[in-house]
């Protein structure tokens, strides 16, 4: 049993050596014969290989290598077992050859790795060569423990699980050969099964290298360093292509998808049934993401990734900025370089799947060639498929992006055609009902019978092209009367709200990210978009502004900020006033709807309302009176009926019809100029636009006059409001003054009343006090006490009593009141003596005078005692 284990292990070593030689040969051949830019030719077979078939050719090369390895195992099994010494010598020689081949391959990779696509593949080849070197060195350093093993563990040894990775020990080959000769029994069937389990895919070499490199320390001098988990390079391989199972080694890869796996990943099913030993290496593996590439330019290196149409981080920095500023709300137009890159890819993509599968089906039917040429061809195909995957993935992004753009364009054109056809049908019915009694209508300038072609061409034209495409020659009116009805039914009628060629909103499948920027797209006769115009929708003023109204999006942002600052009440008042003013009639008799001037030049319907009886102004000559009278009901027409002078007497005046909302043909009477005008108008779309703009400018004077009248009315309204406010303020002022005066009078009246009341109270109080004092004087003071006769006789008793009561003196009593009432006037009255005299000491009177308090001498002036002092 141990001998069988040893033979199986030696067989694994030989298989690894053969696989390493094959890989090195493939690397050298691919570096010499493979063009990394085109990835389409093979120098050996000279056959064109599409990038789509490269992923499907890869498993065939792997299975052929495995079949060759099986044949080598069957033929060399006995030699490996019986000759260990020769085998070790062969291994040393193979190591030297492999090292030389690896050096040559590295040089070839460095010389040929000039393209961006081949950089990742060169790194992968270097990692493969390093792993192959590690494999050869690790095989010699794996010690095997030949200790006796129980019989119960034979089932475990069949799965190659009991590897004992210990320190390196010398192997005794003599004892080993003796054990082998005694116990060896060959079982070819079991060896074949084990070989099928081992050699299913060339990636098993990397798996064994990972297991051995994580458990053994290698000498730095003899081997190259093993790449750490941080230096693992990611290669994009299909995620839906599972590793081949042990029972079916010739499995084929299925539909490729773009996900990533590392070059050093392990497959548990192909190495051993125990997942424990292999899962240890998964701890050191980092999850690698797919190499990111720009959707527009295909570059994989940029300082920052930006959000694109397909999601987060799908554009590089430059393309993201460009798409944000120019093409976010429109449709991206790839550059000329990208279109040139897509041409060979589109040609390869158009090939049917049956042709792509032909080379894959023909390979098993071919007879087996010698091993070396067949292996080289298959390995070259495998290398081409690996290198073409990054380029194919980048090109698929561009193809998908262009396909989505084309789908959106087709959907928009279909919707536009449906809207145009519906509006055309409605207008034709209206026109047929109104003009059923008329016999003559305006016709086309070209007298052709191809009416269906004209209808299909004019159905998708913008309203501007209808002016110059419809012309009438008055000289040929009589010959075209029979075909007027058919021709008129096929003339597109533009101008109504339903038949605007520019949609106000884009379809639901391609709505822009911002609501204020709807798209406007014109289409030519073939249905392809000729112009991508964007409109700006302001949510504050609730209007869609054309792109020509603003220089850039920043100016529109300033407009939105200004609208947001206005109060809502003021905006609503202005809108209501303008709506009221828009209903009034203008001077010319036309009704115009309120607008602020920033109207898209293709939309003439905003000016066309409520006009029922406006006839065209005709400058008729004598030759065309009958025809022009029949055309008097054709409103809104431009009639230039002059056969003599086309420059002097031409008069153009636009009259807008609001019931039919159409612009009929322009009547040019000069037959020589009609053909020239048609040819120049068809070949010059800018001239058509210019003519249309000039025609719109003719409406501006009427519009300006209406705006001026609106401003005057608003001014008068403001003046009236101001007068009303001033009158209200005056009334309030007068009322306030009256209130103040009334309040002041009330205050003064109250203060006077209070002062009078206080005065009357004081007088009453004084009188009462005087009365009481008089009562007390009669009680305590006798009437004749300190009374002296008065020198005069002018005071009466009553007056003395009143004066005494007011001056708080004692009452004056007349002693003769009771006795002599009749002689009061003749007698002297008595007067109370002053208290000073009462209490002062008696003094002798000075003869002839008296002295005052100051000691001054005074002479008495009494006539009775007149005496002069002696002169001394």
From Swiss-Prot:
Keyword Transmembrane helix on entry: no
Pfam family name, one: GATA
Subcellular location: Nucleus
Keywords, ordered alphabetically: Metal-binding, Nucleus, Transcription, Transcription regulation, Zinc, Zinc-finger
The organism's place on the tree of life at top rank: Eukaryota
Record note on disruption phenotype: Cells destined to become spores end up as stalk cells.
GO CC, alphabetical: nucleus
A GO MF label: DNA-binding transcription factor activity
Record PROSITE patterns: GATA_ZN_FINGER_2
Ranges annotated as biased composition (Low complexity): 188-240, 254-277, 349-393, 410-458, 465-489, 608-656, 806-826
Segments of this protein annotated with the region Disordered: 15-75, 89-137, 188-279, 333-393, 410-526, 602-656, 663-682, 806-829
Protein's name in the database: Transcription factor stalky
Organism: Dictyostelium discoideum
Upper taxonomic lineage: Eukaryota, Amoebozoa, Evosea, Eumycetozoa, Dictyostelia
């Amino acid at each position: 049993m141990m001998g069988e284990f040893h033979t199986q292990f030696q067989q694994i070593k030989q298989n690894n050596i053969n696989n390493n030689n094959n890989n090195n040969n493939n690397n050298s051949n691919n570096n010499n014969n493979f063009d990394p830019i085109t990835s389409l030719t093979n120098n050996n077979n000279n056959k064109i290989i599409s990038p789509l078939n490269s992923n499907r050719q890869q498993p065939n090369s792997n299975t052929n290598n495995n079949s060759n390895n099986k044949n080598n195992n069957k033929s060399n099994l006995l030699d490996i077992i019986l000759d260990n010494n020769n085998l070790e010598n062969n291994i040393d020689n193979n190591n030297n050859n492999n090292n030389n081949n690896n050096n040559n391959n590295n040089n070839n990779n460095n010389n040929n790795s000039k393209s961006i696509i081949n950089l990742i593949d060169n790194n992968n080849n270097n990692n493969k060569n390093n792993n192959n070197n590690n494999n050869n060195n690790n095989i010699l350093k794996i010690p095997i423990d030949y200790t006796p093993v129980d019989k119960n563990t034979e089932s475990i040894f069949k799965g190659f699980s009991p590897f004992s990775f210990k320190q390196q020990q010398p192997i005794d080959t003599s004892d080993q050969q003796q054990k082998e000769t005694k116990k060896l029994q060959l079982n070819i069937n079991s060896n074949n099964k084990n070989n099928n389990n081992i050699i299913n895919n060339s990636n098993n070499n990397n798996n064994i290298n990972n297991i051995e490199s994580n458990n053994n320390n290698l000498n730095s001098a003899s081997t190259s360093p093993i790449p750490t988990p941080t230096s693992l390079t990611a290669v994009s391989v299909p995620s839906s292509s599972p590793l081949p199972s042990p029972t079916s080694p010739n499995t084929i890869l299925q539909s490729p998808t773009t996900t990533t796996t590392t070059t050093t990943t392990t497959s548990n099913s192909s190495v051993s049934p125990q997942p424990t030993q292999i899962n240890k290496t998964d701890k050191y593996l980092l999850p690698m993401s797919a190499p990111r590439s720009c959707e527009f330019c295909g570059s994989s290196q940029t300082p920052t990734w930006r959000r694109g149409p397909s999601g987060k981080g799908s554009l590089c920095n430059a393309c993201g900025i460009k798409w944000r500023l120019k093409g976010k709300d429109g449709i991206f137009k790839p550059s000329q370089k990208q279109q040139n890159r897509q041409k060979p890819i589109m040609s390869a993509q158009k090939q049917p799947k049956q042709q792509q599968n032909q080379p894959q089906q023909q390979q098993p039917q071919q007879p087996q060639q010698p091993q070396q040429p067949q292996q080289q061809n298959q390995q070259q195909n495998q290398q081409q498929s690996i290198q073409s995957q990054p380029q194919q993935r980048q090109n698929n992004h561009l193809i998908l992006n262009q396909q989505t753009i084309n789908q959106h364009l087709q959907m928009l054109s279909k919707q536009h055609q449906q809207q145009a056809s519906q509006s055309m049908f409605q207008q034709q019915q209206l026109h047929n009902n109104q003009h059923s009694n008329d016999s003559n209508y305006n016709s086309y300038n070209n007298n052709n019978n191809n009416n269906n072609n004209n209808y299909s061409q004019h159905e998708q034209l913008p309203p501007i092209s209808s002016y110059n495409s419809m012309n009438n020659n008055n000289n040929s009116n009589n010959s075209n009367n029979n075909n007027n009805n058919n021709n008129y039914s096929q003339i597109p009628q533009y101008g109504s709200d339903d038949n605007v060629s520019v949609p106000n909103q884009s379809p639901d499948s391609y709505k822009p990210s911002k609501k204020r920027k709807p798209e406007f797209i014109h289409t030519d006769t073939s249905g392809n978009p000729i112009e991508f115009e964007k409109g700006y929708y302001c949510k504050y003023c609730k209007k869609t502004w054309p792109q020509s109204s603003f220089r850039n999006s920043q100016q529109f942002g300033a407009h939105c900020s200004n609208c947001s600052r206005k109060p809502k009440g003021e905006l609503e008042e202005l809108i209501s006033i303008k709506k009221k003013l828009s209903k009034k009639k203008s001077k010319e008799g036309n009704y115009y709807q309120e607008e602020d001037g920033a109207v898209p030049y293709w939309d003439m319907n905003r000016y066309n309302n409520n006009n029922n009886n406006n006839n065209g102004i005709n400058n008729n000559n004598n030759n065309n009176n009958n025809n022009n009278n029949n055309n008097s009901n054709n409103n809104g027409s431009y009639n230039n009926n002059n056969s003599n002078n086309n420059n002097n007497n031409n008069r153009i005046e636009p009259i807008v019809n609001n019931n039919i909302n159409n612009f009929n043909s322009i009547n040019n009477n000069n037959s020589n100029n009609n053909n020239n005008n048609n040819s120049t108008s068809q070949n010059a779309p800018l001239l058509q636009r210019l003519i249309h703009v000039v025609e719109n400018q003719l409406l501006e004077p009427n519009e300006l006059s209406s705006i001026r009248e609106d401003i005057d009315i608003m001014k008068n309204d403001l003046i009236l409001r101001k007068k009303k406010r001033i009158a209200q303020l005056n009334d309030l002022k007068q009322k306030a003054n009256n209130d103040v005066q009334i309040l002041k009078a009330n205050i003064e009246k109250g203060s006077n009343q209070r002062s009078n009341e206080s005065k009357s109270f004081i007088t009453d109080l004084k009188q009462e006090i005087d009365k009481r004092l008089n009562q007390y004087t009669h009680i305590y003071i006798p009437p004749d006490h300190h009374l002296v006769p008065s020198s005069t006789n002018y005071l009466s008793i009553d007056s003395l009593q009143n004066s005494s009561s007011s001056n708080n003196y004692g009452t004056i009593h007349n002693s003769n009141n009771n006795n002599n009432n009749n002689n009061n006037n003749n007698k002297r009255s008595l007067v109370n003596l002053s208290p000073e005299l009462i209490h002062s000491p008696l003094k002798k009177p000075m003869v002839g005078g008296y002295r005052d308090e100051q000691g001054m001498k005074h002479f008495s002036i009494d006539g009775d005692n007149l005496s002069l002092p002696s002169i001394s």
